[in-house]
Regions:
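Switch/communication elements of ASCE P-loop NTPase nucleotide-binding domains
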Residues: 1-30, 248-377, 396-397
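Conserved catalytic network of the ASCE P-loop NTPase/AAA+ motor domain
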Residues: 50-54, 80-83, 146-150, 265, ...
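Flexible phosphate/Mg2+-sensing switch loops adjacent to catalytic phosphate-binding sites
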Residues: 30-55, 281-289, 323, 348-350, ...
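Hydrophobic positions in the central parallel beta-sheet of the AAA+
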Residues: 155, 294-296, 388
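Extended helical coiled-coil dimerization/tether regions that scaffold
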Residues: 166-169, 176-271, 275-294, 453-454
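Glycine-rich phosphate-binding loops of NTPases
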Residues: 35-51, 67-193, 258, 464-491
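Extreme N-terminal "head/tail" segments of very large remodeling/mechanoenzyme assemblies
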Residues: 1-14, 23-69
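Acidic, divalent-metal-binding catalytic cores of TOPRIM
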Residues: 344-498
C-alpha cells in the first residue's frame, strides 16, 4: 500500500483495522513502543491462524525520499535494499532454536506454543522478493540496532487520550520537549536561576515558616546521638527544575490564567497537538532529526466539526508526514483523493485496502470532479458496506421508506447508504466501485424521465433533448444499474395499445 507524502487519511467503517494499521507502523519503527507490545499474544493474531503450526506475523515498511538528506541517510542507509529504497520488517515467528529443531525433525508442527515465538526487526534484503512471499522460515535482511530507531520520532495520539494528565506530567509533556528543543542560551538560563534564588531566599527568611518547633521536637525524639539541624526552604534551583515547574495557563473572555484541568477535553486535545506541532517544527529547523511522523487516531472523537476541519488543515500545512484514521464525513470532503487509503470489509477474512487515486481508469479531470463532488453527504459512500446512488432527494426519502414498508428492509441496519448525486452524472462515481478503488457493491437507480414520444407520438422536437445516460455501460462486477424508465415506458405503451 503506497502512503503518500504529507497527510494521509485512513478511511473505513468500524472494525476494519484502522487502529491496527497505525499499530503495525509502530511495531516496525516506534522506539517508544514498549517491548511487551511487540511480544504478541494469540488475541493479537488473526483467529484463522493456528500458532501451534509454525507461522508468522510479518509487517513490512518501505521508506523512500531520503537520498541526499544527511540525517535520514545516516539512519536508513544500512536498511537499503536498493538505492533510494529502505525496507524495515517486523516479524513474530518461531525462535531460531525452534526453527532448527523443526528442521531437524526434533519437534513436530502442531506442538508449538506462544513461548516458542519471539519478535525481531530486520532491514534490507532482496528488493525483488515480495513481502507476501516470505515464509516463516526464510531469513531475509539483517538485524538492526534497536537504539537507532530513537532518532526517528513517532508520536501516537490515540482517540481516547488523557491529554490533561500528559500536559501535567513532566515525563510525557510535549511542553518539556519543546522547551528543550528551543535551546535556551546558558546566560538566559542563569538569569532565570538568579531570579529563583532571590525568591527562595525571601521565602526561606520569612518568620512564618521557621522550623524551630520541628527542630526541637526532632531533638526530643532522637536524642543527641542522632541530632540534626532542621530548616525550611527550597532546594538549590536548577534550570531543569524550572522547566518541570512550568505550567500552561489559559485565559479567555470568562476566566484568567486557569489550568487546563478547567478546560474542555476537546480544546485540551487541540492545545496538546499545537505544542507538538511547534516541537516538530523546531526539531526540523535544527536539522538534527532523522525523521518524524504523527499518528493521529480519530480526531473527531473529541472535536466538533469546525475544530476537526481546522486541525486537519493545520496538519496539511505541517512540513512532516502525518497519518490519521477517521470515519468523519467532515474531514474526508476536505482531503485530496490522493490522500485516501480506504479499508473495506468484503466478507472475506482479510480486509481489503485500496488507494482510489491510483486507479488507472480515473484520469486527472475525473479525480478533480470526485474531490469536488464528495461533500459531507456523498462521502458517506466511503464508509458504507454497500451503496445505492440515486438522482435526487425524492429517491433519497422514498426508497428507504418503501423498502421498509413493503419488504421490511431497514437500509441503515444493512449498512447500505443511499447517496443522492443531484444529477445523472453517475459515470464518475461508478468508476470508484472496483477491486482497485472501492471493492463494495453499488446499485445505480435512475428515475423514469420520459421523452415526449413515450407519452404522445404526435409531439415533435424531441431530437433537441439531451441523450439519456447509457447506464448499462457503467455496469461491472461491483455496479448494477436499475432504470425505472424502462418499466414506465412498457406500461405506457400497454396503455396506448389497450
Amino acid at each position: 500500500m503506497a502512503i503518500p507524502d504529507g497527510t494521509t487519511c485512513i478511511i473505513g467503517e468500524n472494525n476494519t483495522g484502522k487502529s491496527n494499521f497505525l499499530h503495525a507502523i509502530r511495531l516496525c519503527i516506534d522506539a517508544g513502543l514498549p517491548s511487551t507490545y511487540r511480544s504478541l499474544i494469540p488475541a493479537d493474531i488473526h483467529s484463522t491462524v493456528d500458532i501451534s503450526q509454525p507461522s508468522q506475523v510479518l509487517i513490512g515498511l518501505e521508506i523512500t525520499d531520503f537520498t541526499g538528506k544527511t540525517n535520514e541517510m545516516a539512519l536508513v542507509g544500512a536498511w537499503q535494499c536498493k538505492p533510494g529504497l529502505a525496507r524495515l520488517m517486523y516479524r513474530f515467528r518461531p525462535k531460531l532454536s525452534v526453527r532448527e529443531d523443526l528442521e531437524a525433525e526434533e519437534r513436530k508442527p502442531g506442538e508449538l506454543t506462544r513461548e516458542d515465538y519471539q519478535w525481531e526487526i530486520t532491514a534490507g534484503g532482496d528488493p525483488t522478493i515480495d513481502l507476501a512471499d516470505i515464509d516463516w522460515d526464510d531469513d531475509v535482511g539483517s538485524s538492526i540496532r534497536f537504539g537507532d530507531l530513537q532518532s526517528y520520532l513517532v508520536v501516537f495520539l490515540p482517540a481516547l487520550r488523557d491529554v490533561e494528565s500528559d500536559l501535567r506530567q513532566f515525563r510525557n509533556s510535549p511542553l518539556a520537549r519543546l522547551i528543550e528543543a528551543m535551546e535556551i542560551d546558558p546566560a538566559e538560563q542563569e538569569k532565570l536561576l538568579d531570579a529563583l534564588r532571590e525568591a527562595n531566599e525571601k521565602i526561606a527568611g520569612a518568620p512564618s515558616i521557621k522550623a524551630g518547633a520541628i527542630d526541637s521536637s526532632f531533638d526530643k525524639i532522637t536524642g543527641p546521638a542522632f541530632s540534626m539541624d532542621i530548616s525550611l526552604g527550597l532546594s538549590e534551583p536548577s534550570f531543569q527544575a524550572i522547566v518541570r515547574a512550568l505550567r500552561i495557563l489559559l485565559t479567555n473572555a470568562a476566566m484568567k490564567e486557569f489550568d487546563p484541568s478547567s478546560n474542555g477535553l476537546g480544546l485540551n486535545n487541540v492545545l496538546y497537538v499545537s505544542i507538538l506541532f511547534e516541537y516538530f517544527t523546531k526539531r526540523i529547523a535544527q536539522k538534527k532529526s532523522a525523521g518524524q511522523i504523527i499518528l493521529l487516531e480519530e480526531p473527531e472523537a473529541h472535536l466538533h466539526p469546525q475544530l476537526q476541519l481546522t486541525l486537519f488543515k493545520a496538519l496539511q500545512a505541517m512540513p512532516f508526514q502525518s497519518i490519521l484514521t477517521t470515519h468523519s464525513t467532515h474531514i474526508t470532503p476536505h482531503a485530496a483523493l490522493s490522500s485516501y487509503v480506504v479499508l473495506t470489509q468484503t466478507g472475506s477474512p482479510a480486509i481489503e485496502s485500496s488507494v482510489p487515486a491510483t486507479d488507472a481508469r480515473l484520469d486527472e479531470s475525473e479525480i478533480r470532479d470526485l474531490e469536488r463532488y464528495l461533500d459531507a453527504t456523498k462521502s458517506n459512500l466511503l464508509f458504507a458496506r454497500k451503496v445505492m446512488l440515486v438522482e435526487g432527494p425524492a429517491e433519497l426519502f422514498l426508497i428507504p421508506a418503501l423498502l421498509k414498508e413493503v419488504e421490511g428492509i431497514d437500509l441503515d441496519r444493512e449498512g447500505i447508504s443511499i447517496i443522492p448525486i443531484y444529477g445523472v452524472h453517475f459515470d464518475v462515481y461508478a468508476k470508484l466501485f472496483s477491486n482497485v478503488s472501492l471493492p463494495k457493491k453499488c446499485a445505480i437507480v435512475a428515475d423514469g424521465d420520459l421523452k415526449p414520444s413515450d407519452a404522445d407520438t404526435d409531439i415533435e422536437g424531441e431530437d433537441d433533448l439531451p441523450a439519456p445516460p447509457d447506464l448499462k455501460s457503467l455496469e461491472n462486477d461491483y455496479v448494477r444499474c436499475i432504470c425505472l424508465c424502462d418499466n414506465v415506458r412498457a406500461r405506457s405503451r400497454m396503455g396506448r395499445n389497450a
